[in-house]
Every structure is written in structure tokens, then in C-alpha cells.
């Protein structure tokens, strides 16, 4: 499976085309809209989320609530486009109109794609860069992730995400929660945090950053349960599932690090405390005493829960802008200000769920049969029986 997205932040719409989704998957707009709404929530979101009412339109690949096996096209309209029709229109405009309407940006913002992208593509107007590099694009990545979650659900895999840290405020590690319990708690938390004792402190940190014109980042964690043993591969570097998951996390806007299992903590512990001892019994088959590997060894699943974390840097669009240089005059200026969030960590956690879900669904479809859901389900059942008796 693969997908490609298109669209600008203030353009008419965002589009994603999904290829390789098996036939026979139950899919309706409500499944996707539920995830889009989750992305819009979270303490610290900016005014843009008050403007947009993200809903999906399925325009191909689905008939009467069932996928056909052909490419699926999803679109999400940008409600704010009505205020940008001249600025972001596709048709040529006159030189006079250009000066009046283009809202040309020549001051790159530190921490963004602005300067590097302008140099790479030769854009003298940085708006041509920021419109596409904006995190608004993650709207349709969440839509793609919603489809992946439907695949996982029908294949017996559950997934959930939560916030571990915001602006230096850390949540306690809460053990032995089911995926359903994680989902219920986070959906009722403004910061998607499991630890209610630090929830208000996280919100205060976000408010303090906003009031001072600053921004803060944090850490999110995604957990998936129900993956069969042996999904992925050790044979080639580009087929290792942990590599794909880390790459997916790092592809999210403003994410600067990824961990699987205990992650970097493994560097501080001896091997005897890091590696997960193997157990077997007639009822469960092969299991592990611990899950420090985060459900992945040698590029393959171990059958234990997948645990992936990502670190998001503070959003670089600040209301007290940092120093920059005008690319036309080369004079020092304060960077341009675009409407933005003070903290998007809770929403980014939803995006992280989506990209992890896509990689897991892709791995299952690739390994157990690509054409139709019924065949994939049968193959997984047979594989699980084989693995248990191995």
C-alpha cells in the first residue's frame, strides 16, 4: 500500500490517493471524520482550527461502504480558502494584482522549511514553500491513517496513542491499561494524557507559552496490540518494520526523534536488563517476560505490543519572532508571523497514531495477501496457528 497527498494550506482542498487498499474493507466517511475531529482537538490549538470543520469526501475506490481494491481518493475542503481565492488561485494574475494580492513573504522563519525550500526550488516568494510544508497537510495523512485503522481493526489489531510530556511536564508511566482504556482516558483529556495529576500543569505550561508569544513541544507514544509474530523482515534493511516506523514518525512535521521500546534508555542498561526473555505455554504459545524491545526485534514483530515514541520540537512560528534575513534586501528583520498553535503535541499524537497505523497495516497486507480482506484474515489465522505450534 502507498499514498500520495496534494494541496496547499490555504488552497481549495487537500487530497490523498491511497493505492493497494484491499477489496472488501468496510469503510465509510464517518470512520474518517471521527479521526479528523480528533486531530482538531487539544489544548493549545490556534485559530485555524476554529475556522476549519474538516470533513472528508470519498470520491473513488469505495462503493456502498465497501472498498473495491482500486485507488481510493479522499478530499478535505479548506473552509478558509474563501479568504484566499486571489492569493492562492491557480490562474495567472497581472503585475499590479500580484503586488496587491500575493501577500509575498521574503522573510524566512527559523525552524521552518522556508529558506531551504526557497533555495531548493528557486522561489522568491516564500509563501510557495510554507503553503505546502505546513502541518495542514497532516489532515489527509490522518484520513489515510483512518483507513489503515479500519484494516487493523478487521485484522484484530488495536492501536492508541497518548502524550507523555509537554514543555518539560512529564506524565507518570501508568501500567496495565488496555488499548480501550487508553482511548477512553485520552479522549476525555484536553492534552491526551493518561496521568490526570499532571494534566492541569501541562495546560498551564501551554497557556504560559501562548501568553509570552512562545511555543512548547513534547513527547507522544503510540501502542498497538495484536500484531502476529514475524511481520517485517531481517533480510533487507528497507524491509525492517522498526525502520519503517521510525521513518514514519520522523516524517511528521516538527518531529525530531523516534524511539522504540525502551529506546535510548537501552544505552544506559546492561544487556541482561534490556533483552526480553522468551516464554512458551500451550495456551499462548511464544511470549516475552518483558517488552523492552517494544514488540520489535531484528526488524520483525515479536507478538508483544508495538511501542513507538516521537519527540516534537516547539512549533517554530512564534508571536515573538526570531531574527531572520530578508532574502530580497539581505537586511536583518524579525521573521514573518503566520497564524499558528502554541502547542500541537496532543494533535500530533493523533498524527503519530495515523502514520504508525499505516505502516502496520501496510506490513500486514504485504505479508499476508494484498487483494482482499477475507484472504488476509484467513492467512493471518493460519499463520498464528503455525507460530503457536512452532
Swiss-Prot record:
Q: Which PROSITE patterns match?
A: CHORISMATE_SYNTHASE_1 (PS00787), CHORISMATE_SYNTHASE_2 (PS00788), CHORISMATE_SYNTHASE_3 (PS00789)
Cofactor binding description: Reduced FMN (FMNH(2)).
Keywords (alphabetical) are:
Amino-acid biosynthesis, Aromatic amino acid biosynthesis, FAD, Flavoprotein, FMN, Lyase, NADP
Q: Name one GO biological process term.
A: chorismate biosynthetic process
Record: residues binding NADP(+): 39, 45
Pfam families from the xrefs?
A: Chorismate_synt
Look up the EC number in the record and give it. Answer: 4.2.3.5
Highest taxon in the source lineage: Bacteria
For FMN, which residues are the binding ones?
132-134, 253-254, 298, 313-317, 339
Q: Name one GO cellular component term.
A: cytosol
Q: Which reaction does it catalyse?
A: 5-O-(1-carboxyvinyl)-3-phosphoshikimate = chorismate + phosphate
Q: Name one GO molecular function term.
A: FMN binding
Q: How is the quaternary structure described?
A: Homotetramer.
Q: Tell me, what does this protein do in biology?
A: This reaction introduces a second double bond into the aromatic ring system.
Family membership: Belongs to the chorismate synthase family.
**Designated name of the protein:** Chorismate synthase 2
The gene name reads aroC2
Amino acid at each position: 500500500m502507498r499514498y500520495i497527498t496534494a494541496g496547499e494550506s490555504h488552497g481549495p482542498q487537500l487530497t490523498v490517493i491511497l493505492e493497494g487498499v484491499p477489496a472488501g474493507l468496510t469503510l465509510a466517511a464517518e470512520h474518517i471524520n471521527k479521526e479528523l475531529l480528533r486531530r482538531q482537538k487539544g489544548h493549545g490549538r490556534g485559530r485555524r482550527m476554529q475556522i476549519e470543520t474538516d470533513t472528508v469526501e470519498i470520491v473513488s475506490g469505495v462503493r456502498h461502504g465497501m472498498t473495491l481494491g482500486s485507488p481510493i481518493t479522499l478530499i478535505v475542503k479548506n473552509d478558509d480558502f474563501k479568504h484566499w481565492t486571489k492569493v492562492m488561485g491557480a490562474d495567472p494574475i497581472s503585475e499590479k494584482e500580484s503586488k496587491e494580492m500575493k501577500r509575498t513573504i521574503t522573510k524566512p522563519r527559523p525552524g521552518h522549511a522556508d529558506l531551504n525550500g526557497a533555495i531548493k526550488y528557486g522561489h522568491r516568494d516564500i509563501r510557495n514553500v510554507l503553503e505546502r510544508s505546513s502541518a495542514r497537510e497532516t489532515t489527509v495523512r490522518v484520513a489515510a491513517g483512518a483507513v489503515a485503522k479500519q484494516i487493523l481493526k478487521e485484522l484484530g489489531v488495536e492501536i492508541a496513542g497518548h502524550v507523555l510530556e509537554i514543555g518539560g511536564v512529564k506524565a507518570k508511566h501508568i501500567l496495565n491499561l488496555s488499548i480501550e482504556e487508553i482511548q477512553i482516558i485520552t479522549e476525555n483529556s484536553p492534552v491526551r494524557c493518561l496521568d490526570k495529576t499532571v494534566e492541569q500543569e501541562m495546560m498551564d505550561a501551554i497557556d504560559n507559552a501562548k501568553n509570552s508569544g512562545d511555543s512548547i513541544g513534547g513527547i507522544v507514544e503510540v501502542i498497538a496490540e495484536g500484531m502476529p509474530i514475524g511481520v517485517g523482515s531481517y533480510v533487507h534493511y528497507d524491509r525492517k518494520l522498526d525502520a519503517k516506523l521510525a521513518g514514519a514518525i520522523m516524517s511528521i512535521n516538527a518531529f525530531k526523534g523516534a524511539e522504540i521500546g525502551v529506546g535510548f534508555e537501552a544505552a544506559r542498561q546492561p544487556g541482561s536488563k534490556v533483552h526480553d526473555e522468551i516464554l512458551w505455554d500451550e495456551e499462548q504459545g511464544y511470549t516475552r517476560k518483558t517488552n523492552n524491545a517494544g514488540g520489535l526485534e531484528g526488524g520483525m514483530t515479536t507478538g508483544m505490543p508495538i511501542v513507538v515514541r516521537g519527540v516534537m520540537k516547539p512549533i517554530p512560528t512564534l508571536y515573538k519572532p526570531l531574527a531572520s534575513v530578508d532574502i530580497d534586501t539581505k537586511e536583518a528583520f524579525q521573521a514573518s508571523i503566520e497564524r499558528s498553535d502554541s502547542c500541537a503535541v496532543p494533535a500530533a499524537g493523533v498524527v503519530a497514531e495515523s502514520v504508525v497505523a499505516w505502516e502496520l497495516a501496510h506490513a500486514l497486507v504485504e505479508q499476508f495477501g494484498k487483494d482482499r480482506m477475507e484472504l488476509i484474515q484467513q492467512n493471518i489465522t493460519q499463520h498464528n496457528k503455525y507460530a503457536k505450534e512452532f
